[in-house]
Structures are given as C-alpha cells and as structure tokens.
Amino acid sequence: MNVIEGAIAAPNAKIAIVIARFNSFINESLLAGALDALKRQGQVSDDNITVVRCPGAYELPLVAQQVAKSDRYDAIVALGSVIRGGTPHFDYVAGECNKGLAQVALEYNTPVAFGVLTVDSIEQAIERAGTKAGNKGAEAALSALEMVNVLSQIES
C-alpha cells in the first residue's frame, strides 16, 4: 500500500501571502505567524515569499486569482478576518471569500490555504491570531506547504 503524505519543510517553495488590510490589527498578527512558520518550520527563504495586500477579505479571491494566474507561486496563503456585526454583511463577505478562494484553488490547481478568521467577536479574533487558540495564520502557512508537497508527490 502506498501512502502519500506531505512534509512541512519545503525550502524551495515559492509562496504568496495575500492579506486584507481591513482589521489590520488582527491580520498583522496572522501575517507574523505565517511568516514565522514558513521560515522556521518550512525553511522557506525570504526571497521565496511575496506578500500582496488588498483592501479587505471580499477582495482576497480576485487577488489570489491573479497571483495563481501568474504561475509564479507554488501556493497561496490567504489571510484576513471577518468579524460578525449586527447586519448580514458578515455572512456575505465570509461566504463569498471562502467560495472564491476555493474556486481559485480548483481552477488553477494551486493550493490556497484559508487563513481568514470568521468570528463572532473581536475577542475570538484576538484568541485565534496568536493567543489562546494559537495562530491561524501559522496554521494556514503550514497547510499550504504540506499541500505543495502532497501535490508534488502525486504528480511525480
């Protein structure tokens, strides 16, 4: 029986991080976690990491699509945060962001790791951006590296 599993180390991987500016006080912590994981655990050099900023989570899929279309990156890490408010806006933004990023991954055969927090409160966002609940940016970055290695093994 053959088992394909992806390692986390991917020193030659070219990674694009697309990050929303809206809720930047949360997103910058996600970015710090992602960069730390890529460099320390994934052994990816600074030269192989590109950070692309966009206005908000709703814009992440279009930016990710253009990054994937460039065919210069092995994986994309999408980072942002959508915090529930008193209107249905949260549902629209979170849903379309999720759907759009998944579509990019399938359309361009490029791993797109979902590091977008969809939370009910600012406290939950803070917990998931590096305090009680770990750093979801770091988790997304490691997921992207693992997918690069899994797909590489499948293709070889």
Curated annotation (Swiss-Prot):
Pfam family for this entry, one: DMRL_synthase
CDD domains: Lumazine_synthase-I
PANTHER family: 6,7-DIMETHYL-8-RIBITYLLUMAZINE SYNTHASE (PTHR21058:SF0), 6,7-DIMETHYL-8-RIBITYLLUMAZINE SYNTHASE DMRL SYNTHASE LUMAZINE SYNTHASE (PTHR21058)
GO process annotations (BP): riboflavin biosynthetic process
One cellular component term from this protein's GO annotations in UniProt: riboflavin synthase complex
Role this protein plays: Catalyzes the formation of 6,7-dimethyl-8-ribityllumazine by condensation of 5-amino-6-(D-ribitylamino)uracil with 3,4-dihydroxy-2-butanone 4-phosphate. This is the penultimate step in the biosynthesis of riboflavin.
Keyword Iron-sulfur: no
One function term, GO molecular function aspect: 6,7-dimethyl-8-ribityllumazine synthase activity
Alphabetically ordered keywords of this record: Riboflavin biosynthesis, Transferase
Gene: ribH
Family: Belongs to the DMRL synthase family.
Record protein name field: 6,7-dimethyl-8-ribityllumazine synthase
EC number: 2.5.1.78
